[in-house]
Every structure is written in C-alpha cells, then in structure tokens.
C-alpha cells in the first residue's frame, strides 16, 4: 500500500484541496480519490485557527469512518475539541475559538451532526497508526521507540503534545525535548505538531508540519517514496510560530 501523509491542516481547506490535487487526487465526487488507490493519512489537528474547520471534520469523517479509505491520528487540538463536544470545561482559546464560532453559527440540527461525526471520528481512531507491516507509524507529535505498542496515559500525553518538560517559553508555549534525535528505530515515524519551515528528517522520523495556518506551507509525505510535496498557504506569515528546535 502507498500512502500520502498530510501535515497539520488546521482548517485550511483550500490548501488541502490544492495539495491533494497536486498529489494526483480527483475531487469530482466531492472527496479526494486517487486513481492508483493511494491512501491518505492525517497526523491530526485538522481544525482550529483556519477558516474551514467544520468542512475538514466532514471530509475526514467521510474518508476515515464512512468509506474507510484513509487514516487519522488525533492531535492535541482534536483532543480539546473532543472534550468541548463532550461538554467538559475547556478554555476556548489557542484556535479553538474559530472552530466554536463556526459551530455556533450553525442551526442546532447541523450542530448535532457535526458533533456526532467528530466524536465518532475521535473515539474510533487510535492514538497512532502502525502501517506497512510495522515499517511506518503515523502520529501527531511523535512517539518514543519504547512507547510503540503502548496506549497508556503517558504515551497519550507524548503522542498529543510531544516530549514536554513542564517548562514554558516566554510566550507561554511549552518547552519540548528533541525526541527525534534520540530515536534509533528502523520504522519511519511521520508526525507534525511543531511548525518547521521545511520538512525535518532526523534519523527515521519526519516532521511534516510546515505551518500552513501560520502562512507557511501544507506538506505531504509520499510513502514509501519518502518524497515531500508542499503547497503555499494563503494566510499571512507568522514568523514567531516557527521556533528553532534545539
């Protein structure tokens, strides 16, 4: 099986359409379909900050749950939206406010439909996908080699948020260790979460979050070819979001 793994979309629907078309997908049915049966995989954070979060929920639900033709691993923004839809007490900030504004503008029956689709998508998707006979892992923020195969709370925190230290940068964002430098496995780990200006290959890991929602690019990794394909963002560039990884 051949996969096209898509970085953090964050509601950037036009960029997602442009990228999939560049990858050879056809949208005539209303969904991206590849003539050679390649499968899409998403590293999570499909919503928040960008203009079309709810449409992205519908598309990914259709591909993953209804048609079972794609793979989705939830991100930290997905986790927060899931908790919001469950009625938990979450702070509507850091991008969630854009998704909530879209949601609250809908009539109640459409709200219920979106809520049910996203809850189903989240609950029926694993923390990370192990594909191609364990040669490929797709997850949101990465995973340590000794965590592969586990699903406990410690692993969930790592997969959703990265290798956080508990410390904060001056802007309030978490300080993260560079786990990829320590990875010694042979399986390729493809992830996003931390915006980088260029796809970052370190050992057998690839960060493909090139900051589409911050004016960078939306990037896909073609597997097993190990080629990256990107399209430019239509949004303003926010340079401070592309923090160097120590």
Curated annotation (Swiss-Prot):
Signal peptide: none annotated. Its EC number is 3.6.1.17. It catalyses: P(1),P(4)-bis(5'-guanosyl) tetraphosphate + H2O = GMP + GTP + 2 H(+). One of its GO terms (molecular function) is GTP binding. Keywords: GTP-binding, Hydrolase, Nickel, Nucleotide-binding. CDD domains: MPP_Prp_like. InterPro entries: Ap4A_hydrolase, Bis(5'-nucleosyl)-tetraP_PrpE, Calcineurin-like_PHP_ApaH, Metallo-depent_PP-like, MPP_PrpE-like. GO terms for cellular component: cytoplasm. It holds the Pfam family Metallophos. It comes from the Bacteria. Its cofactor is Ni(2+). Asymmetrically hydrolyzes Ap4p to yield AMP and ATP. HAMAP family: PrpE. Belongs to the PrpE family. This is Bis(5'-nucleosyl)-tetraphosphatase PrpE [asymmetrical]. The gene is prpE.
């Amino acid at each position: 099986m051949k996969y096209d793994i898509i970085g953090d979309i964050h509601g950037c629907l036009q960029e997602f359409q442009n990228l999939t078309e560049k990858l050879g997908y056809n949208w005539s049915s209303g969904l991206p379909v590849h003539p050679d049966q390649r499968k899409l995989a998403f590293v999570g954070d499909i919503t928040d900050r960008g203009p079309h979060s709810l449409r992205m929920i519908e598309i990914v639900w259709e591909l993953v749950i209804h048609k079972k033709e794609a793979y989705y691993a939830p991100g930290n923004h997905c986790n927060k939206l899931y908790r919001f839809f469950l009625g938990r007490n979450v702070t509507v900030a850091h991008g969630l406010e854009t998704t909530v504004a879209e949601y609250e503008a809908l009539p109640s029956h459409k709200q219920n439909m979106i809520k049910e689709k996203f809850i189903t998508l989240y609950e029926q998707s694993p923390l990370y996908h192990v594909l191609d006979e364990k040669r490929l892992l797709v997850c949101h923020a990465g995973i340590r080699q000794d965590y592969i195969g586990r699903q406990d709370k410690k692993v969930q925190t790592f997969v959703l948020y990265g290798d956080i230290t508990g410390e904060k940068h001056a802007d309030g964002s978490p300080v993260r260790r560079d786990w990829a430098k320590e990875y010694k496995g042979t399986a390729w780990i493809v992830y996003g979460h931390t915006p980088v200006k260029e796809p970052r290959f370190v050992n057998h890991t690839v960060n493909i979050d090139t900051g589409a929602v911050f004016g960078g690019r939306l990037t896909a990794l073609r597997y097993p070819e190990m080629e990256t394909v990107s399209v430019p963002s239509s949004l303003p560039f926010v340079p401070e979001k592309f923090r160097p990884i120590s």
